[in-house]
């Protein structure tokens, strides 16, 4: 009967008209015991990091050796284990191995919020531009692993501070914040452009925490005077496609009345991140990559930048679900009524039909 497909269609429509809800965090992996925490404002620690970017202050970027890469990979692996398994031994081992690279791993109890973090940063006696890496000490295993990155600090209009705000606001749902330690244009041949280097400590950290099913959000900024026709925010996955995280972020930004553009392979090509090294790695390993270019108009407008930061934070807290659609209660009621009518009619017809 032709009416049956119609009924099925109505049922399907009614199902998808329901609001989208996502399960709350059921279990929270607390930081391990046996760690000595330094209680101070995390922002104070981060300010030290921000004040040491090479390019902002005099200095020279130093190329790591193969041994440096191997040692850092060990450190990052131990941190990953320490957080995911709440294992104090791994954190203590990571701290010990980090000293071989003149890095320090600081367990910080943020006095402003009570949240706990591990901060991996170069000792103050050295400054090679290798970057700093912050990790939430408490991990929510029911959430999508999220990494926030700022590969172009200083140059990209305060991108490192924007990334930090999202990282801390979404605690503990963001696994890590990765921040380059050098201004992107310092090297004459692109040596310090971490978004386009296949070998760097920054890339090593990216690869250590980018896994199948994770989401990497990279924060960038562009000068509106150089791109006057672009919207306030341009999003891209790097190859002209769209992933769920990108769609969810775009939806939240639109709800905040921020104009957005999505690189589709053609439009917004200059801001599309086609050659972004971290994006290529993420896509190859089944992770979602979201490259976010923010107009300088937004960055220097307190209201707009707050809207941007809150939109991304909410996307993360919602596990990249779309904002709920308003339910139309009439649809499921009508569908149920039609189904009931034809069920009764069919039953009566079968009774009157001769055997």
Model-inferred region functions:
Residues 17-290, 294-321:
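N-terminal catalytic or cofactor-binding beta/alpha core of small enzyme domains
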Residues 1, 323-324, 354-355:
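Short, Lys/Arg-rich N-terminal segment immediately upstream of the first membrane anchor
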Residues 321-335:
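Juxtamembrane/start-of-transmembrane alpha-helix segments at the extracytoplasmic/lumenal side
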């Amino acid at each position: 009967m032709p009416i049956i497909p119609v009924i099925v269609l109505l049922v399907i429509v009614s199902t998808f008209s329901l609001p989208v809800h996502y399960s709350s965090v059921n279990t929270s992996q607390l930081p391990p015991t046996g760690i000595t925490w330094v209680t101070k404002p995390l922002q104070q620690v981060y300010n030290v990091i921000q004040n040491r970017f090479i390019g902002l202050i005099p200095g020279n970027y130093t190329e790591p050796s193969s041994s440096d890469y191997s040692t850092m990979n060990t450190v990052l692996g131990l941190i990953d284990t320490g957080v995911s398994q709440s294992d104090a031994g791994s954190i203590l081992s990571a701290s010990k191995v980090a000293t071989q690279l003149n890095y320090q791993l600081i367990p910080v109890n943020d006095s402003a919020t009570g949240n706990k973090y591990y901060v991996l940063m170069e000792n103050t006696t050295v400054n090679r531009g290798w970057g700093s890496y912050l990790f939430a000490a408490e991990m929510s295993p029911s959430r999508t692993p999220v990494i926030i990155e700022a590969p172009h600090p200083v140059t990209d209009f305060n991108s490192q501070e924007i990334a930090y705000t999202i990282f801390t606001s979404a605690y503990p749902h963001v696994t890590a914040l990765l921040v380059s330690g050098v201004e992107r244009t310092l090297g004459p041949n692109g040596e310090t452009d971490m978004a386009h280097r296949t070998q760097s400590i920054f890339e090593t950290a990216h690869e250590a925490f980018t896994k199948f099913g994770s989401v990497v959000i990279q924060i960038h900024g562009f000068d509106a005077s150089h791109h006057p026709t672009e919207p306030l925010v341009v999003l891209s996955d790097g190859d002209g496609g769209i992933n769920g995280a990108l769609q969810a972020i775009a939806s939240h930004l639109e709800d905040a009345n921020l104009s957005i553009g999505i690189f589709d392979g053609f439009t917004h090509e200059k801001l599309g991140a086609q050659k972004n090294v971290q994006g290529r790695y993420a896509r190859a390993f089944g992770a979602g990559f979201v490259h976010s270019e923010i107009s300088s108009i937004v960055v220097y407008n307190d209201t707009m930048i707050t809207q941007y930061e809150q939109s991304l934070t909410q996307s993360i807290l919602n596990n990249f679900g779309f904002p709920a659609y308003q339910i139309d209660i009439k649809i499921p009621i009508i569908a149920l009524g039609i189904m009931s009518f034809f069920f009764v009619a069919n039953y009566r017809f079968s009774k009157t039909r001769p055997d």
